[in-house]
Amino acid sequence: MDIDLVYLWVNGNDPKWQAKRDACIGRPTERQENCKGRYADSGELKYSLRSIEMYAPWIRKIFIVTDDQKPEWLNTENPKIQVVDHKEIMPAESLPCFNSTLIEHYLDKIPGLSEHFLFSNDDMYINQPVTPATFFAADGLPILYMNRKPFRKLALWFRDNVKGKPLSMYLKIIRNAAELVEKYYGTYYGCKPHHNIDSYLKSTITFTNRKFEKEFSPMVPHHVRAADDVQRSVYSYVALAEKKGHLHYVSHKHSFRLHIDNHKLYEKFEQYNPVFFCMNDSEFANDADRKAAIDFLESKFPKKSEFEK
Protein backbone atom coordinates (compact mmCIF):
# COMPACT_ATOMS: atom_id res chain seq x y z
CA MET A 1 0.00 0.00 0.00
CA ASP A 2 1.45 3.37 -1.03
CA ILE A 3 0.92 6.06 1.61
CA ASP A 4 1.70 9.72 1.00
CA LEU A 5 1.86 12.64 3.41
CA VAL A 6 0.43 16.13 2.85
CA TYR A 7 1.40 19.29 4.71
CA LEU A 8 0.03 22.82 4.52
CA TRP A 9 2.80 25.37 5.01
CA VAL A 10 3.11 29.14 5.04
CA ASN A 11 5.98 31.47 5.80
CA GLY A 12 4.22 34.34 7.50
CA ASN A 13 7.53 36.21 7.78
CA ASP A 14 7.83 36.61 4.00
CA PRO A 15 7.32 40.32 3.02
CA LYS A 16 5.86 39.36 -0.37
CA TRP A 17 3.31 37.08 1.30
CA GLN A 18 2.56 39.72 3.96
CA ALA A 19 1.82 42.32 1.29
CA LYS A 20 -0.54 39.90 -0.45
CA ARG A 21 -2.30 39.14 2.83
CA ASP A 22 -2.59 42.79 3.87
CA ALA A 23 -4.05 43.76 0.48
CA CYS A 24 -6.63 40.99 0.73
CA ILE A 25 -7.70 40.89 4.38
CA GLY A 26 -5.79 43.61 6.23
CA ARG A 27 -3.02 43.41 8.77
CA PRO A 28 -3.23 40.58 11.33
CA THR A 29 -5.04 41.32 14.56
CA GLU A 30 -5.35 39.39 17.78
CA ARG A 31 -8.68 37.95 16.61
CA GLN A 32 -8.33 34.19 16.51
CA GLU A 33 -9.31 33.74 12.86
CA ASN A 34 -6.66 36.22 11.66
CA CYS A 35 -4.02 36.52 14.38
CA LYS A 36 -0.25 36.59 13.96
CA GLY A 37 0.13 33.13 15.47
CA ARG A 38 -2.00 31.63 12.72
CA TYR A 39 0.64 32.48 10.11
CA ALA A 40 3.82 32.43 12.20
CA ASP A 41 6.65 30.27 10.91
CA SER A 42 9.47 29.34 13.26
CA GLY A 43 10.87 26.45 11.25
CA GLU A 44 8.49 23.83 12.64
CA LEU A 45 8.22 21.96 9.33
CA LYS A 46 11.93 21.15 9.36
CA TYR A 47 11.54 19.33 12.67
CA SER A 48 8.33 17.63 11.61
CA LEU A 49 10.15 16.21 8.59
CA ARG A 50 12.99 15.07 10.83
CA SER A 51 10.44 13.17 12.89
CA ILE A 52 9.07 11.59 9.71
CA GLU A 53 12.52 10.42 8.65
CA MET A 54 13.18 9.00 12.12
CA TYR A 55 9.89 7.26 12.74
CA ALA A 56 7.99 6.86 9.42
CA PRO A 57 10.58 6.38 6.64
CA TRP A 58 8.11 4.16 4.75
CA ILE A 59 6.08 7.17 3.56
CA ARG A 60 6.21 7.27 -0.25
CA LYS A 61 5.93 10.98 -1.14
CA ILE A 62 5.60 14.19 0.83
CA PHE A 63 3.49 16.99 -0.67
CA ILE A 64 3.91 20.49 0.76
CA VAL A 65 1.00 22.77 -0.20
CA THR A 66 1.97 26.46 -0.20
CA ASP A 67 1.16 29.87 -1.65
CA ASP A 68 4.04 30.49 -4.08
CA GLN A 69 6.57 29.75 -1.34
CA LYS A 70 8.99 27.08 -0.25
CA PRO A 71 11.27 26.80 2.78
CA GLU A 72 14.78 28.04 2.04
CA TRP A 73 16.28 24.99 3.72
CA LEU A 74 14.13 22.45 1.82
CA ASN A 75 15.89 20.03 -0.53
CA THR A 76 13.43 20.10 -3.42
CA GLU A 77 15.68 17.74 -5.39
CA ASN A 78 14.81 14.95 -2.98
CA PRO A 79 12.52 12.60 -4.98
CA LYS A 80 10.17 12.24 -2.02
CA ILE A 81 9.42 15.97 -1.86
CA GLN A 82 6.92 17.81 -4.04
CA VAL A 83 5.87 21.42 -3.49
CA VAL A 84 2.29 22.14 -4.62
CA ASP A 85 1.06 25.69 -5.16
CA HIS A 86 -2.47 26.71 -4.16
CA LYS A 87 -3.29 27.64 -7.74
CA GLU A 88 -2.60 24.05 -8.85
CA ILE A 89 -5.50 22.71 -6.79
CA MET A 90 -7.85 25.62 -5.97
CA PRO A 91 -10.26 27.72 -8.06
CA ALA A 92 -9.17 31.24 -9.02
CA GLU A 93 -11.96 32.87 -7.00
CA SER A 94 -10.48 31.40 -3.79
CA LEU A 95 -7.06 32.95 -4.37
CA PRO A 96 -5.15 34.25 -2.61
CA CYS A 97 -6.23 31.99 0.22
CA PHE A 98 -5.36 32.44 3.90
CA ASN A 99 -8.03 29.98 5.05
CA SER A 100 -6.56 26.56 5.84
CA THR A 101 -10.07 25.16 6.29
CA LEU A 102 -10.83 25.91 2.65
CA ILE A 103 -7.46 24.68 1.36
CA GLU A 104 -8.09 21.33 3.06
CA HIS A 105 -11.17 20.81 0.89
CA TYR A 106 -8.95 20.49 -2.20
CA LEU A 107 -6.44 17.89 -1.04
CA ASP A 108 -7.85 15.33 -3.46
CA LYS A 109 -6.83 17.63 -6.32
CA ILE A 110 -3.11 17.23 -5.59
CA PRO A 111 -1.56 15.68 -8.72
CA GLY A 112 -0.18 12.21 -8.08
CA LEU A 113 -1.51 11.88 -4.54
CA SER A 114 -2.01 8.26 -3.47
CA GLU A 115 -5.43 6.86 -2.52
CA HIS A 116 -4.21 6.28 1.04
CA PHE A 117 -2.66 9.41 2.48
CA LEU A 118 -1.92 11.24 5.71
CA PHE A 119 -2.51 14.90 6.46
CA SER A 120 -0.46 16.93 8.89
CA ASN A 121 -0.01 20.51 9.88
CA ASP A 122 3.60 21.61 10.13
CA ASP A 123 3.37 21.71 13.93
CA MET A 124 2.69 17.96 14.24
CA TYR A 125 5.46 15.53 15.16
CA ILE A 126 5.98 11.80 15.58
CA ASN A 127 7.61 10.79 18.85
CA GLN A 128 7.85 7.00 18.44
CA PRO A 129 8.21 4.50 15.57
CA VAL A 130 4.95 4.03 13.64
CA THR A 131 3.91 1.72 10.80
CA PRO A 132 1.21 1.87 8.11
CA ALA A 133 -0.96 -0.15 10.52
CA THR A 134 -0.92 2.85 12.87
CA PHE A 135 -3.02 4.72 10.32
CA PHE A 136 -4.82 2.11 8.21
CA ALA A 137 -6.52 -1.11 9.32
CA ALA A 138 -5.96 -4.52 7.72
CA ASP A 139 -8.94 -3.88 5.41
CA GLY A 140 -7.23 -0.77 4.05
CA LEU A 141 -9.65 1.68 5.67
CA PRO A 142 -8.35 4.65 7.67
CA ILE A 143 -8.21 4.60 11.45
CA LEU A 144 -9.95 7.80 12.54
CA TYR A 145 -8.43 9.07 15.77
CA MET A 146 -10.89 11.37 17.50
CA ASN A 147 -11.33 13.05 20.88
CA ARG A 148 -13.94 11.45 23.14
CA LYS A 149 -14.48 14.77 24.96
CA PRO A 150 -18.22 15.56 24.76
CA PHE A 151 -19.12 17.37 21.57
CA ARG A 152 -22.79 16.50 21.56
CA LYS A 153 -25.56 19.02 21.10
CA LEU A 154 -26.52 19.22 24.77
CA ALA A 155 -22.92 19.83 25.82
CA LEU A 156 -22.55 22.58 23.23
CA TRP A 157 -25.88 24.18 24.20
CA PHE A 158 -24.86 24.08 27.89
CA ARG A 159 -21.55 25.73 27.07
CA ASP A 160 -23.17 28.49 25.02
CA ASN A 161 -26.21 29.20 27.20
CA VAL A 162 -25.38 28.18 30.77
CA LYS A 163 -21.63 28.55 31.16
CA GLY A 164 -21.62 31.60 28.91
CA LYS A 165 -18.50 30.42 27.11
CA PRO A 166 -19.12 30.84 23.38
CA LEU A 167 -17.59 28.32 21.03
CA SER A 168 -14.32 29.25 19.38
CA MET A 169 -14.23 29.60 15.61
CA TYR A 170 -12.50 26.22 15.45
CA LEU A 171 -15.26 24.45 17.38
CA LYS A 172 -17.97 26.21 15.38
CA ILE A 173 -16.69 24.88 12.07
CA ILE A 174 -16.38 21.37 13.52
CA ARG A 175 -19.98 21.61 14.69
CA ASN A 176 -20.95 22.69 11.17
CA ALA A 177 -19.37 19.48 9.86
CA ALA A 178 -21.15 17.27 12.40
CA GLU A 179 -24.54 18.89 11.76
CA LEU A 180 -24.16 18.65 7.99
CA VAL A 181 -23.46 14.91 8.18
CA GLU A 182 -26.36 14.45 10.60
CA LYS A 183 -28.69 16.19 8.14
CA TYR A 184 -27.92 13.66 5.41
CA TYR A 185 -27.18 10.49 7.37
CA GLY A 186 -29.31 10.88 10.49
CA THR A 187 -26.36 10.37 12.85
CA TYR A 188 -24.66 13.09 14.88
CA TYR A 189 -21.05 12.21 15.63
CA GLY A 190 -20.24 13.68 19.04
CA CYS A 191 -16.48 13.31 18.70
CA LYS A 192 -14.01 15.83 17.38
CA PRO A 193 -10.49 15.93 15.91
CA HIS A 194 -7.52 15.81 18.26
CA HIS A 195 -4.48 17.36 16.54
CA ASN A 196 -3.28 14.10 15.04
CA ILE A 197 -1.58 13.19 11.83
CA ASP A 198 -4.83 12.09 10.21
CA SER A 199 -5.44 9.31 7.68
CA TYR A 200 -7.78 9.54 4.69
CA LEU A 201 -8.88 7.84 1.52
CA LYS A 202 -8.68 10.27 -1.38
CA SER A 203 -11.84 8.73 -2.83
CA THR A 204 -13.80 9.58 0.34
CA ILE A 205 -12.80 13.23 0.05
CA THR A 206 -13.87 13.32 -3.61
CA PHE A 207 -17.15 11.57 -2.76
CA THR A 208 -17.87 14.02 0.08
CA ASN A 209 -17.05 17.07 -2.03
CA ARG A 210 -19.48 15.93 -4.71
CA LYS A 211 -22.20 14.99 -2.23
CA PHE A 212 -22.03 18.34 -0.44
CA GLU A 213 -21.09 20.53 -3.40
CA LYS A 214 -24.02 22.87 -2.77
CA GLU A 215 -23.28 23.15 0.96
CA PHE A 216 -19.55 23.71 0.42
CA SER A 217 -19.94 26.31 -2.34
CA PRO A 218 -20.39 29.32 0.04
CA MET A 219 -16.88 28.63 1.36
CA VAL A 220 -15.19 29.11 -2.01
CA PRO A 221 -14.72 32.93 -1.75
CA HIS A 222 -13.73 32.80 1.96
CA HIS A 223 -10.12 34.02 1.81
CA VAL A 224 -9.98 33.82 5.61
CA ARG A 225 -11.72 31.43 8.00
CA ALA A 226 -15.42 32.15 8.59
CA ALA A 227 -17.97 30.89 11.11
CA ASP A 228 -20.02 29.08 8.45
CA ASP A 229 -17.05 27.11 7.07
CA VAL A 230 -17.06 23.30 7.32
CA GLN A 231 -14.01 21.74 8.94
CA ARG A 232 -12.28 18.73 7.34
CA SER A 233 -13.63 16.50 10.12
CA VAL A 234 -16.58 16.23 7.72
CA TYR A 235 -14.51 13.68 5.77
CA SER A 236 -14.03 11.54 8.87
CA TYR A 237 -17.72 11.77 9.77
CA VAL A 238 -18.72 10.73 6.25
CA ALA A 239 -16.20 7.88 6.38
CA LEU A 240 -17.90 6.64 9.55
CA ALA A 241 -21.39 7.06 8.10
CA GLU A 242 -20.39 5.22 4.91
CA LYS A 243 -18.51 2.52 6.88
CA LYS A 244 -15.28 3.62 5.21
CA GLY A 245 -13.27 4.11 8.39
CA HIS A 246 -12.67 2.83 11.92
CA LEU A 247 -13.20 5.14 14.91
CA HIS A 248 -10.55 5.07 17.66
CA TYR A 249 -10.62 7.42 20.63
CA VAL A 250 -7.32 9.00 21.62
CA SER A 251 -5.63 9.52 24.96
CA HIS A 252 -2.71 11.73 25.94
CA LYS A 253 -0.45 8.72 25.45
CA HIS A 254 -1.47 8.66 21.80
CA SER A 255 -1.51 12.36 20.95
CA PHE A 256 -0.56 15.31 23.12
CA ARG A 257 -1.09 18.99 22.40
CA LEU A 258 1.47 21.47 23.72
CA HIS A 259 0.43 25.12 23.82
CA ILE A 260 3.77 26.85 23.43
CA ASP A 261 2.77 29.69 25.77
CA ASN A 262 2.16 27.18 28.62
CA HIS A 263 5.59 25.92 29.66
CA LYS A 264 4.17 23.62 32.34
CA LEU A 265 2.92 21.33 29.59
CA TYR A 266 6.48 20.31 28.76
CA GLU A 267 6.53 18.39 32.05
CA LYS A 268 3.25 16.70 31.10
CA PHE A 269 4.77 15.71 27.77
CA GLU A 270 7.55 13.79 29.50
CA GLN A 271 4.96 12.11 31.71
CA TYR A 272 2.84 10.81 28.82
CA ASN A 273 5.58 10.21 26.19
CA PRO A 274 2.95 10.28 23.40
CA VAL A 275 3.15 8.72 19.95
CA PHE A 276 2.31 12.09 18.37
CA PHE A 277 2.47 15.63 19.64
CA CYS A 278 1.47 19.08 18.45
CA MET A 279 3.30 22.33 19.25
CA ASN A 280 0.36 24.71 19.02
CA ASP A 281 1.05 28.41 18.40
CA SER A 282 -1.64 30.91 19.35
CA GLU A 283 -2.53 34.56 19.67
CA PHE A 284 -1.17 34.39 23.25
CA ALA A 285 2.35 33.21 22.35
CA ASN A 286 5.32 35.57 22.12
CA ASP A 287 8.77 35.31 20.56
CA ALA A 288 10.27 33.90 23.76
CA ASP A 289 7.66 31.13 23.76
CA ARG A 290 8.49 30.31 20.14
CA LYS A 291 12.22 30.18 20.88
CA ALA A 292 11.59 27.81 23.80
CA ALA A 293 9.50 25.61 21.50
CA ILE A 294 12.26 25.46 18.88
CA ASP A 295 14.84 24.64 21.56
CA PHE A 296 12.62 21.77 22.66
CA LEU A 297 12.25 20.50 19.09
CA GLU A 298 16.00 20.76 18.51
CA SER A 299 16.57 18.59 21.57
CA LYS A 300 14.08 16.01 20.27
CA PHE A 301 15.21 16.02 16.63
CA PRO A 302 18.82 17.25 16.43
CA LYS A 303 19.86 15.30 13.33
CA LYS A 304 19.56 16.97 9.93
CA SER A 305 17.24 15.02 7.61
CA GLU A 306 17.57 14.08 3.95
CA PHE A 307 14.89 16.70 3.24
CA GLU A 308 17.24 19.55 4.13
CA LYS A 309 19.90 21.11 1.91
Residue ranges and their predicted role:
Residues 211-309:
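C-terminal catalytic/acceptor-binding lobe
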Residues 70, 107-147:
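GT-A fold catalytic core of metal-dependent nucleotide-sugar glycosyltransferases
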Residues 57-60, 108, 112, 125, ...:
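Hydrophobic/aromatic-lined pockets within catalytic cores
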Residues 39-56, 89-120:
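A conserved donor-nucleotide-binding helix/loop in the catalytic core
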Residues 3, 60, 115-117, 122, ...:
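Residue-level detector of short, conserved catalytic/binding motifs and their immediate flanks
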Residues 142-221, 226:
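Long, charge-rich alpha-helical interaction segments
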Residues 1-88, 243-244, 269-309:
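N-terminal anchoring/stem segment of glycosyltransferases
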Residues 78-92, 130-151:
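Short, flexible helix-coil linker/hinge segments at the edges of structured domains or between repeats
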